[in-house]
Structure formats: C-alpha cells, structure tokens
Swiss-Prot record:
Name of this protein: Forkhead protein sep1
GO molecular function: DNA-binding transcription activator activity, RNA polymerase II-specific; DNA-binding transcription factor activity, RNA polymerase II-specific; RNA polymerase II cis-regulatory region sequence-specific DNA binding
BP-aspect Gene Ontology terms: division septum assembly; negative regulation of transcription by RNA polymerase II; positive regulation of transcription by RNA polymerase II; regulation of transcription by RNA polymerase II
Composition bias, Low complexity: 340-355
SMART domains assigned: FH
InterPro entries named in the record: Fork_head_dom (IPR001766), FOX_domain-containing (IPR050211), TF_fork_head_CS_2 (IPR030456), WH-like_DNA-bd_sf (IPR036388), WH_DNA-bd_sf (IPR036390)
Phosphoserine sites (modified residues): 446
Keyword RNA-binding: no
Biological classification of the source: Eukaryota, Fungi, Dikarya, Ascomycota, Taphrinomycotina
Location in the cell: Nucleus
Amino acid sequence: MNFNSTNPYYFTHEKNLNNASKYSELPIAYQEIPLQSLPPYPKVASKLKGVVAGGKENNIASFQKPSSKATRPYIPSYTRLTYSVPPLPIPPPSEQSLDTIIYRNPSVSSSQSQEPEEFFLPLDDGKKPPYSYAMLIGMSIIRSPDRRLTLSAIYDWISNTFSFYNKSNNGWQNSIRHNLSLNKAFMKIERPRNLPGKGHFWSIRPGHEEQFLKLKLRKPGVNSRPAPPVQDVTSSTKYGSSTGSSGFNTFNTSPHIFNQRHQYLQNYYTASLTNIPTISNVNATNFHPLHSQQPYVDTPGIDAPSDLEAKFSDLGVSSVVSVTSPLQSCTNSPSPPLSSPASSASPSESLRNESLGIKSAKSLGLNKDDAPVEGPPVSHLEKDVETPSVHDSVLGFNDTVTNLGKKGLKDGTTNTLQIPAVRLPSLPSSPTIKNPSGLLLKRSNSIDFPTPPKALCPKLFCFRDDIVADDYTKFSLLSPIRSDMSGISASPNTNLKEHRTRILQMLATPDAKQLSSLTSSDAEFWSVTPLKSSILRNGDASKQVTLSESPKGDSLLDGGSLSYFTNNISSVAGLETPSKLPMSKSFDTFEDDFLDPMDMLSFENHFSDFNSNRKVSPVKREVRRKYISSATTIHSSAAQDDTYLPSPTKRKMPLLRQTSTLF
C-alpha cells in the first residue's frame, strides 16, 4: 500500500482533490514541490529512551533529509496545509512608545480640535475648585504641548493653577496617584531611552478625550449668567416710535467681549451686580410698569411687548416696556429720569420676581381705562401703598391690584398705581434678605395675620371681656386659653396657681363655682384640689364645726358621729361630698393614737387639725399593729382596706392576714 495514497494531507488523495482549489494561492514553495519527492511522516523509534540523570533528553529520531534541490526550503508534510501566520502580539500600554501613539481629534465639533494654548485658564478664587481629581488630571494633560506629563508635572500644574492645592498638604497628591492608576481614561507611557530625565509619562487614552474637552463648553447655572452689556438708549430711538427700526438695534453688544473664548468664559465666574447693564438718559414715560392707552406700533421683529419681554428675559436683561400716554406723545415733554429697581436688580432677582407672582400689566388683566397718570418713582411709593395681607393674597393678587387702581381713579388722585412688594406669608422677611423690588426689608415685630373673630375664641377659653387685637400678637395663636397677662410673674408657684385656676374654669366643675368665695388666702388655695372637695375650709367653716357641736355618742369618732361630721362639713362648705364613708356602725371605736397617722382620703386633715399638730403625708400608709383595738372585727378591717386603701398593683391577701395588718 502506497503511503502517499493514504496520507490525508496530500492532494493526490481522492478525499482532498475537491479542496485543491482552496490552496491555489499558496506560496510557490507549496505548489512546485513534487508530491513524490516529499518524504512521508518521520518514523519515530518504537522504544523511547527515558530521561538521563543529568535532566537532558536523548535524541529520539532525526528527520530524513529531502532528496530535492537544496535551493528549495524544506517544509514538513504535516504542517503544509495547516500552517498560518499568527498576528503580532499587541504590547500593553506600559510598553508603548511615544512614536506609536496617534492622537485623533474627535469628530464632534471643530472647536474641540484646538491647540492646548487655546483652552481657557480656570479661575482661581482661593477656594476648592469644583472639579474632580480625574478632571484636574485631564485638564493638566490636555493643556500640555505634547499631551503628556509626568507625575511631578501634574502636581506642579495643579498647585500653580489652584492655590487651594498647596504642596504642604500632600493628601490630594495621593488621590491624584490613585486616579491615574485606577481610571481607565489614563495610560502610562514609558520614557524613551534617548530622552533625558526620569519617570514615565501619563497621557489620555485615545477615545477618552471627549470627557475632558467638554469642560471648555461647560456653562454655569442660570442665576450666575451675566447679561451682555447694553449701550445707552437715547430719546430718539424708543420703542413705539415711528422710525420702524427694530428695538434691538439700540442694544449693541461690545465686540471685544467675544474676541477670545477663554475671556468670555471667565465672565461666567465673575458675574456680579457691577456687570448688570444700567440704563440712563431715558424718560420716565418709556419705562412705566403699566400699559397706557396708546396703541402699539408694529415694529419688525417685535409683535407685542410680551415678545420683547420674552427676548429680554433670554438675554438676562430685566423686562422693560416703554409706554407713553396720548398727552405725552403729543407734547413730547421730557420728565425726570426714573430709577427703577428692576433695572438694578440681578437676573436672579428677576427670576425670583416671576416665581413670586409679580407679573406685567398685561398679565394682571388691567383695562385701558385703568391706566393711571405718571407719578413719583417706584422707590418712593412703597410707603404709600400698603402691603397686601394674607386675606388679600387669598382673594387674588390680580383683584387687589385692580381694586387699588379703580380706587385711585375715583378719588382723582394723581398717584401712580404701583405694584407693591409681595412677601410670602410663610417666609418672613429677614434683615439679610432683600425683597423682589431690591429694597431691604426690616423684620416685622408682629405676625402679619388677620385678627381672628371672637366666634373662634369662646368665652370658656377667654377670661377677659375687653380682649383687643394686640393680645393675639403677644403669644402664640396655638394656645387656646387667654388669661389676663397684665401681671406676669416669674414665680413658679404663682404660675401654678393661675394654671390651676384656668383649668378649673375650663373644666367647669362644681368646685370651680365656689372657688373664689371659699379661698381667701394662698394657704387655703393650695389645699383646694378638684379631687378633695370635702377638705375646703375657711374661717366660718372652722368656727361652726367644733367638738361641742358634735352629737352625743360613746366617742367622737364612732359611726354616727363620723357620718354627721362629714355631712356637716359638706353642708357648711356648700359642696357635695363625692362619696360617703361606708363604715359600719357595729364596730368598736378606734383609739386616737391609731387614727392620727392613718391616711384616709376624706378625713385625714380633720383629725390632724383637732388631735395633732403634724400633717399626715398622703403617701404614708403605715399602721402599727399594737394600736389596733382587740374589738376590731374582720368585717370592719376588710371594709377599710377595700374602700380607703385601694392598691391595684398589690395582690389581695387572705382575710385572716388582713385582720392583723390591714394590708
């Protein structure tokens, strides 16, 4: 059997004849070698020799040299058809050279393909810049001539550009190193051997430049946007004149502001009140806040004052409407200049005016007949016009302005209707915050709320009939109780006494009706509580209740005398005792020594006054066993324990134990 006929790698095999056309473009070395001259597979020795002690392998077998010409290269048969050239390995970014890096400008816009020196220099105000560490690195690299910097050069650029990052504090340098190694937008470049110095370079990876180029197109917020400068407007070029020229022709922007882009971008950060345009040499008739009866003249580019206001608001200039009356248009007599606060206010304040509801005369819904005559400047009219209250703001700001305008026309006054400064009810003015008109407001001493009617304060809560409106501004409106605070005292006892009086009157208890007649001194007042009405006593009650007037009995404190004593006290005081003493008349008398320290709710003070000089504490409930009379029965002790010594937290004891301890 021929070896070549069974070899699948030879074209002569019938299985590979169809695939011969695929390899027609092989090099000449593959095509011109005759198949018969190529040797078969090399023969491998049947027994392979092992590894010697030295660790080197012995030669297994040697290939047979080809018998063809020596000029033709020898290619083994088993690699002839499967041979392919692998792609060259791509070195890592750290091994790239400077010559292999190609910077491609992004195709976003032509302005991004500028040179490094054309980028604006960030403004340094001494504070921490509003940029991340990655953005600072990108700003430094993208502004370098070669678009590459060493680590020390990045440190120098950041510290020289921003004074906040000084070299004395090395904390930010650690953050720079971490961002360089972890951020995918930066790559490390090895320094060429022929370039003096030490340290590798850092550059921006191709394709990541856009995020750092966006910085030069970044715009600040709306509040910090400065308005373009406005030239002076003369009386010859006014809105509404018959010249037919556009109103924007008089507002020429200075061309030197936009010569250099970095200078224009720096203006965003240096916006202040000094950059706001000021309008001078303008007649007061041209800047009246309300529309007049004169019809508007069609002007190319401007259809109505609303369009003018909209375009001016886009430019950051306060809305200005020039309106003249028929009489003034005929006479053309100049008037004193008007200094409007809106012209000196910043764009942020003009936006705040719109949010607070200050609208133009057209949006307020005023008719042509409501147009007033020229009056004093706006800055002098705030004292004459009252600030609308909360009630007016609820009815509607438009109705308030309309009513004020009609009132001024009926009276025949020549004062101009001006829109007063509006202040939100929930936001009181502060000494440091200006109102929308630009004038400093002082903090009001009282609450700007309407006086509540007396129907909201019933007589139960109001103890004075001569309540005036000033009383509602002294204290919080949340307090439902109003007492006479003319004699305010800092003594806590006095305050507690007044508080008890107010609570008794508010609850309308029976004790409160006779509180003033029964208590003639502070000592008697402190003994009065809503829960202990039977202990009320005064000079008359103490005189009537004596030992001699008590009924005859075995002792003073037997069952009959005790009930008579309590009934007499309640009848003298004119009050009704909450509960009767449910003591039985069948038990024997107690000794005086036992009842003295006894803590009974209804008669503790009576016996302490008559029999002893000391007052029993309401929390002391000690009873000594030796003072208990032998005639005391189980029934009487159990009744006393359940009635006069309630203890919901204690467990009930057996009856035999209660006989000995009463607990």
